[in-house]
Regions:
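Short, Lys/Arg-rich flexible segments
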Residues: 1-75, 80-126
Length: 126
């Protein structure tokens, strides 16, 4: 039995481009969700608003990735010390380990996957 398979290279490229675009938009959506959850320590807002950003999408093997980075001098110290007494005037849910709810095992762990799938379907026209 002979089987002939033809791959539509143009369709594959469109799907790959849709995955890259959806990953970038997913990173921005997760970042917006973190900000709206008001979980980051907030004094004047610089760490949350200016020093936290989603990177450009990149490939890690077959995976398309985007990172959310908080690039400020105090971020590591605050993140890894949830025992600190964080002020909650500006962000009522402020505390350490602020990314944890969106990571595996967290209460929002499905947010990124569900958002990516929805955005990928939109971008790919599915």
């Amino acid at each position: 039995m002979n089987v002939k398979v033809e791959l539509d290279a143009a369709a594959i490229k469109r799907l790959e481009a849709a995955a890259v675009t959806a990953a970038g938009k997913t990173g921005e959506a997760v970042l917006a969700e973190i900000r709206s959850a008001q979980v980051m320590p907030f004094d004047n807002g610089t760490m949350q608003n200016a020093d936290t950003y989603a990177t450009e999408t990149y490939r890690d093997g077959e995976a398309v990735c985007v990172d959310i980075i908080t690039d400020s001098p105090q971020a590591r110290r605050l993140y890894y010390h949830p025992e600190y007494d964080f002020q909650t005037v500006n962000n009522p849910n402020a505390g350490g380990m602020w990314y944890e709810p969106w990571l595996s095992g967290g209460i929002e762990e499905d947010f990124a996957e569900e958002t990516f799938m929805r955005l990928f379907a939109e971008e790919a026209g599915l």
